[in-house]
Design a protein with these regions (language model features):
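Alpha-helical hairpin repeat boundaries in alpha-solenoid proteins
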Residues: 1-192
């Protein structure tokens, strides 16, 4: 039930279920800690989510993803990046969900130096050929003001879907490079 309220971001009903969990004495069950962290993070209550995150002695990947995504999606970019750095510092395996949330946070920070660090990390990871990760990298570089690096990612992405093309086109448009955006749009149409 808690997951359903998380999916629709119904904080009030989620709190109601949380109250029931407390009443039943199940608040510190690992699966419920994960669900509570995810629910509060997704609903914008990142401080509460972090409290539950901190209750786990050995947070699993789902919990790390929930917390990093929660920070990134609610404008706590520095916290998301910091938690991602902590995660990789502890040699905890990441997945494309983790990486995309960290990329979103890097884009929000807007630091080209941080963007380059993220890109370097991804190039050494198993996510380097993930089309969703590469699309996020293109968007990140565009938001950090580097269309040159965005284009490098675009060009090295072998499986270009419409979302990859669109990310690069939007990047050009974002920086007033209408001619490049139109040319790339025509190239996309020709590519099929």
């Amino acid at each position: 039930v808690l997951r359903a309220y998380t999916d629709v971001e119904d904080l009030e009903q989620g709190k109601s279920v949380h109250g029931y969990v407390i009443k039943m004495g199940l608040e510190y069950e690992p699966d419920l800690l994960i669900s509570l962290t995810a629910m509060y993070a997704k609903c914008g209550q990142v401080t509460v989510a972090r409290f539950f995150f901190n209750q786990m002695k050995l947070p699993n990947l789902i919990l790390w993803n929930a917390m990093i995504s929660g920070y990134a999606k609610n404008g706590y970019a520095e916290e998301a990046v910091g938690l991602f750095r902590e995660m990789i510092g502890k040699n905890i395996s990441v997945d494309s969900i983790t990486v995309r949330a960290a990329i979103l946070a890097c884009a929000q920070v807007g630091s080209l130096e941080l963007a380059r660090w993220m890109d370097d990390y991804i190039m050494r990871s198993e996510c380097r050929d993930d089309v969703f990760v590469n699309t996020a990298l293109i968007d990140m570089y565009a938001k950090c003001g580097s269309l040159d690096f965005a284009r490098i990612i675009f060009d090295r992405t072998l499986q270009k879907d419409v979302v990859v093309w669109s990310a690069m086109i939007v990047g050009y448009g974002l920086h007033g490079q209408g001619r490049e955006a139109i040319d790339l749009y025509h190239a996309m149409k020709q590519a099929g």
